Amino acid sequence: RALRCAALLLALPLVAGAAAPPPASKSDDPVVAAREALRKKDKPQLAAARQALLARGHPLAQWVDYWELSNRLGEAQQPELTAFYARWGGTYVEDRLRNDWLLELGKRRDWAHFSAEYPRFRMNDDREVSCYALLTQHQAGQDVRSAALAAWYAQREMDDGCTLLASTLYEAGRLQADDAWQEARLSMEANRPRAARFAAGLVNPLHDKAMAELLDNPVRFLARQGGQRSPADQQLQLLALMRMAANDPDYAAGQLDASWGRRLPVALAATAWAHVGKQAALKQLPQAAHYALQAWQVWDGGKKPAHPASSPPAALPWSDDLLAWQVRAALRLPASDPQRWQLATRAIDAMSAAEQREAAWVYWRARATQALARPGAEGDAARAAAQAALQGIATQFSFYGKLATEELGGRTTLPAAPAPLTAAEREAPRQQPGFARALQLIELGLRNEGVREWNFTLRGLGERELLAAAQLACEREVWDRCINTSDRTKGEIDMA
């Protein structure tokens, strides 16, 4: 897939050089004027534009209708939404407005209307809406703990839906302090301090002051900790070390070596080292692999903690992203260093099952297995397993598929060109209103709206239909949609 994108991208300068100059400004177009009215929050002008374009039967009237209603969604009532859905059933704007309305209903805590609307949400790709939906399922007596944790841990920014879900389940006893501390660590790792502060505050509102201090100055916070050894204190100390590591991983490593590596329980000390290693890897520091190995040594009990009874929990609380950076740090070690493949193996094996199935980690795990296999007959089983893993991804038309093919001694060949599109196949996307609207929006300079309309229209298309849609975009010189749509095919691959 990367090879196909590269070929298309290399062709772009040649084609773009021959393209016509950009069209004149479309600022006088009524749809563009309506979009400008939305930007200015000019409700009267937007309402007038909506009425005029609806009366004319303009092909983009539905977008102006959407802008007008979404601009006053806070005061809208269900009958208005129902009428909109009836006018534009099956279109992108219908589902887009339903998405917006579900968010509004969640903020209103109108769970009856939310529960009625949610099953009709076709895209179902909004994480906050998913959190609201899980909350309604919890209210109905369903066990949503696992799904709620997954949604909460995956949120990028604090939003009402996922924070409400977390706080509700925490108050109900369905989430525990360990869950909240894990969210605090994940948020700190992702540099989302507000989310980390919220999670710590769930455990105890009094933690808010400590979180503010450690976020502002982790060095000073740790210096003031003295003999605080409660479990909550130790969690806060770990967060401070993570914050410190993000600024200066070597300094944080020094703090762990000097005292904190012994003062914290094994699991927390190991996690601190793991985050020091990730931050060092992000900065491409040569000692990153050493820090990662130190994390595993502590996790395995290689260092005696201050609390002899403490031991690592069964589940490793490190993210897939952190483990991926451990692999990258390992691969920067010299090929002759045996710890290179040991660290890579350990990190990949600790990833989630879904992450381990990614071609990159299948490839590097196989390479590690080959490198660590015993010589002679004792290593035959390991080498056979590595070869089978490489064969499993060698058929993929991707970067790591190519590397696997070469590792197996083969040569990468381009896939056979698909049969030419028939006249009927080429005509089909031209008759699709969604594609027509998308191209018109892009031509007007409303690219964001056009791309969303285009992608929605691609839903459910087969391989040949995708090729035809890609061809239409190429002919119209909408190059990002040309490449993106072509890249969606799995079997019908056109490299021309």
Please annotate each region the language model reported.
Residues 17-496:
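Cell-wall glycan-active module
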